[in-house]
């Protein structure tokens, strides 16, 4: 079955989601000014042929480092506007990111089982 859901695609998507929630929403940076995909949509899963494992992991690490810098300037209950949700606080964003990453760790677990039969016993 053709799919963009790959181990590396999951990491690439996670980086885009970090950028979207922390840099765009909390940091207030326009998406077009963010270095890398900041939408979390289908293109965020697509790892181009020129990208390497180390490069995609470095992108995720970089996005997380910027996220930590931005979050350091907020209290947990400090809220910012969101175009669909009204207001979101840092606490809400953290909880959303935990859910988002947990869901995709589950996807990675299923992919791993398909690759080599390893299960998370």
Model-derived features: where do they sit?
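Acidic/histidine-rich alpha-helical segments that form the ligand environment
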Residues: 42-81, 91-97
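Short, contiguous alpha-helical
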Residues: 1-43, 82-121
């Amino acid at each position: 079955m053709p799919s963009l859901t790959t181990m590396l695609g999951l990491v690439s998507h996670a980086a885009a989601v970090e950028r979207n929630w922390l840099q765009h929403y909390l940091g207030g940076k326009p998406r077009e000014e963010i270095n890398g995909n900041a939408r979390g949509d289908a293109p965020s899963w697509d790892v181009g042929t020129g990208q390497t494992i180390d490069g995609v992991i470095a992108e995720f690490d970089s996005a997380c480092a910027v996220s930590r810098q931005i979050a350091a300037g907020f209290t947990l209950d400090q809220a910012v506007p969101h175009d669909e949700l009204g207001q979101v606080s840092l606490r809400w964003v953290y909880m959303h990111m935990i859910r988002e990453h947990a869901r995709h760790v589950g996807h990675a677990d299923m992919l791993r089982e398909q690759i080599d039969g390893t299960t998370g016993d």
